[in-house]
């Protein structure tokens, strides 16, 4: 499943939409 291209701040993968992971070094989902 593709990650929607929406900038979302995160600390953990669970903060992101389905299909996304948290890029912890920039604190955004991707």
UniProtKB/Swiss-Prot annotation:
Disulfide bonds join 3-20, 10-22, 16-29. Pfam families: Squash. Gene3D superfamilies: 4.10.75.20. The record marks 5-6 as: Reactive bond. GO terms for molecular function: serine-type endopeptidase inhibitor activity. Keywords: Disulfide bond, Knottin, Protease inhibitor, Secreted, Serine protease inhibitor. It is found in: Secreted. The keyword Magnesium does not apply. One of its GO terms (cellular component) is extracellular region. InterPro entries: Prot_inh_squash, Proteinase_amylase_inhib_sf. The keyword Oxidoreductase does not apply. Transmembrane segments: none annotated. Inhibits trypsin. The presence of a 'disulfide through disulfide knot' structurally defines this protein as a knottin. Belongs to the protease inhibitor I7 (squash-type serine protease inhibitor) family. This is Trypsin inhibitor 4. It comes from Cucumis sativus (Cucumber).
